[in-house]
């Protein structure tokens, strides 16, 4: 079967309490039920369930008391990555937004997103409006990491929890763990069925693309340069957090540079890019992200590069999120398919 056949681009623990059918507890209030269970010697946490709370253990092993699914109405998040998880699982629970969207981006997002209160994000050293969190009656905060969850991630989330009193769950949302993250969040948000479908889709995309590109020798992989920033002279190294999409899609990322920790975007010179002579360039667009796609296509200084000479400079789709990197979430699985088809159309 051809690679193209494989790579056809397709688009884009709630606790249950079972009680006997007898009339033992019928007509009782929550307090009466709790008292009855206590008298029966039942100390398993069912009382918390009747009061609308339950215990949940996050990816770091922290156990927090959170609302039961039927009582959970307003959720917030510490980053755009965590917001994507909630967007794709249970958008009706969004208690605000950590991003300010353009009209073009809003076209692809759930109805009502434009009315969400902006409360900030902890990404990139930003801040969340603690007072607004309380004013908006946020019941739960989700923190998702783009890399393997670290003690620093947990410390930041714990600080927010200490300041607001709102339970904060830390979820490992790294690339290798993203399917598990969806399953956990589906459990938290009462969206297990949808989380299962998304997890299956992500696994299928990954398996199909990697199977279709696995047989390509390193010497035959297409040389790719990722042009970031307003001049196209910032990039991400092979295996860097913001370059994983290219690696999975089977590209030969030419950027032999050190990764800039945190935000990435390592500076390079045009002379270095000329020496790398990539066959394909993927650039930010100049309208939404202020990128250099048109500069690269039209500026004579870039004209000697193979990608430019052969008309293989491509603008990365950016709505509603960048398809290849930021935030490093489920959006990258669109990018994986797009890039693999573009590099290896046969």
Located regions from the model:
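Short helix-initiation/N-cap motifs at beta->coil->alpha
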Residues: 61-62, 119-129, 259-270
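Alpha-helical, coiled-coil/dimerization segments enriched in small aliphatic residues
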Residues: 239-264
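A short, structured surface patch at a secondary-structure boundary
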Residues: 81-136, 140-151, 254
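Extracytoplasmic substrate-binding proteins
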Residues: 48, 53, 155-232, 317-346
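Ligand-binding pocket segment of bilobal, Venus flytrap-like solute-binding proteins
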Residues: 254-256, 263-290
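Short helices/loops that flank or line small-molecule/ion binding pockets
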Residues: 126-137, 184, 267-277
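Bacterial Sec-exported substrate-binding components of ABC uptake systems
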Residues: 2-20, 28-84, 193-226, 342, ...
């Amino acid at each position: 079967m051809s690679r193209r056949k494989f790579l056809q681009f397709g688009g884009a623990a709630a606790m249950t309490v079972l009680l006997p059918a007898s009339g033992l507890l019928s007509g009782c209030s929550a307090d009466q039920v709790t008292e009855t269970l206590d008298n029966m010697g039942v100390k398993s946490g069912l009382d918390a369930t009747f009061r609308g709370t339950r215990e949940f253990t996050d990816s770091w092993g922290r156990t927090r008391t959170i609302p039961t699914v039927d009582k959970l109405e307003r959720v917030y998040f510490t980053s755009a990555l965590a917001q994507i998880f909630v967007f794709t699982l249970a958008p009706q629970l969004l208690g605000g937004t950590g991003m300010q969207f353009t009209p073009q981006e809003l076209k692809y997002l759930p109805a009502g997103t434009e009315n969400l209160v902006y409360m900030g994000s902890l990404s990139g050293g930003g801040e969340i409006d603690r007072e607004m969190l309380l004013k908006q009656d946020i019941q739960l905060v989700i923190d998702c990491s783009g890399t393997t969850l670290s003690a620093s991630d947990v410390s930041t989330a714990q600080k927010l929890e200490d300041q607001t009193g709102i339970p904060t769950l830390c979820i490992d949302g790294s690339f290798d763990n993203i399917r598990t993250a969806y399953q956990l969040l589906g459990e938290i948000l009462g969206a297990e069925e949808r989380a299962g479908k998304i997890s299956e889709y992500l696994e299928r995309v990954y398996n199909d693309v990697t199977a279709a590109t696995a047989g390509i020798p390193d010497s035959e992989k297409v040389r790719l340069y990722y042009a970031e920033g307003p001049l196209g002279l910032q990039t991400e190294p092979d295996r860097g957090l913001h370059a994983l999409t290219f690696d999975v899609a089977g590209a030969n990322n030419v950027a032999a540079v050190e990764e800039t920790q945190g935000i990435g975007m390592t500076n390079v010179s045009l002379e270095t890019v000329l020496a790398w002579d990539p066959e394909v360039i993927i650039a930010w667009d100049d309208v939404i992200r202020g990128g250099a796609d048109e500069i690269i296509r039209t500026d004579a200084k870039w004209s000697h590069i193979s990608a430019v000479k052969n008309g293989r400079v491509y603008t990365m789709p950016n709505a509603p999120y960048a398809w290849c990197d930021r935030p490093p979430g489920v959006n990258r699985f669109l990018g994986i398919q797009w890039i693999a088809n573009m590099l290896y159309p046969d």
